[in-house]
Amino acid sequence: LYITWGVFVISTSLSYLYSAQSVILTADQNVYLVKLITGLTRSLAYILQIFLMICGVSFWIVCAIELLSNVIQLILFNRLTLKKYPQLVKLDITDTINKENIISVKSKIKREIKYTFVHKIAGVVVFNTDYLIISVFLGITVITSFSSYMMLIQALGFLISAIASPLGAYIGAKLYSDSKEKVIRIISLYNSLFFMLGVFCAYMFYISSSTFVSLWMGKEIVLSQQLVLLLSVNCFVLIARISFDVAKVGLGYMSDIELPLLEAIINIIVSLVLVHYLGLNGIVIGTIVSNIIVVMILKPVFLYKNALKSDNAFIIHELIRSWFFISIFLLSIFFITRAKVIVSNEWLDFFIQVCMSSITPLLLLIMIYSVFDSNVRKFMFVMFKKMYREN
């Protein structure tokens, strides 16, 4: 037991030794290299660990593979950064920055670390409150059904967040190379794109998640379609908020520490009140209320007003614009398809129906945003122009 624990501690400690290198690569818009190294080494480690466990090898050896994975990552990150940034070896920071600036930078870094810590703690509270309240008031059995759907939402959010992570470095680079107005246009475009992606994923989740869970874990795990609709709203928020989170990282703005705390408080209070009247629906509604108030309204307001110094008229216009397009899509898709839920008893038929059902909402979203949203229209024009030149 102590050997296994010691291996895990050493393995975790090693991961901090190459954090500086990953930060440098990310800041230089080479996050794909970070993802390549970490993704490849972890994937190989997981495959080897699974193989060793199947073979019945001692567990401490399986844990040692994790340690070996971090050692390999440390070596690869060190070699890569030395190759790409050889000037770092000879660079003496005291030659380029005076002591007063060093103290100022250290103070700012410490402050931002504290703010980030508060954000992370509040995020843990928000994302785990539902499970705690469900286990206390509704029982452990309900968690199985709830977590099956949440696993799909979180996996989708994790995948999209991983793809979107380089955008933060891009915004940071543009902040210092271009005007504030151009940075605002870029963030506005990201808002439109992630709102599009969010509402598309939420719609597909609504019509397909219950059948997926039924095929995966059995019909007894399936939740009511009314509850699935509520979870779809949370799915939309989880994806749409990525644009704001990416912008915050790019702008280095973590000062809104009161917002995640407010989100957690609203979520807990509303969920505790509504669980007595609406059961599981009430808990999900509590999360929706906190998401809409804090994540979808207050967070962009704080971002535009404090980080970008935008005026109130622009902020109101940006919020109304985003929700207006979503409303048009929802009304149109309901009128066209009636949001018919996919029903299937076979995996192949299910995936075929998912592919077929995704065509209409995807085309409808592209049409709505290309007609009404100038940012998306210009973006699509540039993409088509690049494709035409390549051909």
Residue ranges of model-derived segments:
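Interfacial transmembrane-helix starts/ends
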Residues: 109-113, 147, 179-208, 225-228, ...
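Helix-terminus/linker motif at the lipid-water interface of multi-pass membrane proteins
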Residues: 51-56, 117-120, 124-155, 173-174, ...
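Helix-loop junctions and terminal segments of transmembrane helices
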Residues: 27, 85, 90, 153-191, ...
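Short runs within selected transmembrane alpha-helices of multi-pass transporters and secretion channels
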Residues: 7-26, 34-49, 62-78, 119, ...
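Membrane-proximal transmembrane or re-entrant/amphipathic helices at the cytosolic face
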Residues: 90-91, 306-311, 334-391
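Interfacial/gating helices of multi-pass transporter permease domains
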Residues: 59-64, 104-112, 134-154, 182-185, ...
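Interfacial segments at transmembrane-helix termini and the short loops linking adjacent helices
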Residues: 1-7, 205-236, 281, 308, ...
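Interhelical loop/hinge segments that connect adjacent transmembrane helices in multipass membrane
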Residues: 63-66, 75-128, 170, 178-185, ...
